[in-house]
């Protein structure tokens, strides 16, 4: 069978891990990482400095990996932390208010890991350099930037080309990556180093900003102290795609 056809067929199948949660295969290959400073959407905004850490735009190669189709819910997280008490009505919502350490521990407990920052961006943007999961033009109401968190499968418009839900809005997500400069970046940022973990994706919190379009862009990078908990931040898990069905030896944190 033609290799490209095989890859295409593989993408339509869901993968189950130890927790039987649906995962999607993101194939190996290059994708567009980062943001072009000449991007049309930035030219109409006055606050451009927060996008400097996502430059320069470049082609970046990643090995194949799996990523959860949906964010981890309260119901799933309570299996890991049964002492946590959440209202029944929240069970189908993405868990939030968990620290990076708690998110990381959950993913390892379930036999997975947090996605690296670059993995998250590829799963969200695909290979065609789009700024939002639906394209390059901001569409208000397509993703959740409202007042309330919604179920992980609520918005059919907020689905990437790899069938990953909720990457543009609802809650931001922890990644495994430290906040570091991109390859070939000339930006000097005092926050670079192993102090903050990168979070990705828009959230209901971003509606309070006047530059919602910029903060909602998939290349946008945010960062937070790993020990902190935020009411608009959750997570999903990932797993390396191993050859011949061999189990992943463990995460390689960026």
Where are these regions (language model features)?
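C-terminal motif of bacterial Sec signal peptides marking the signal peptidase cleavage site
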Residues: 15-16
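A short glycine-rich, aromatic-capped structural motif
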Residues: 19-86, 99, 169
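Short, structured beta-strand segments at or near domain termini in extracellular proteins/domains
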Residues: 230-247
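Functional-site microenvironments in short loops/helix caps that host divalent-cation chemistry
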Residues: 26, 32, 37-38, 86-222, ...
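Sec-dependent signal peptide cleavage junction
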Residues: 22, 245-254
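Sec-dependent signal peptide recognition
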Residues: 2-7
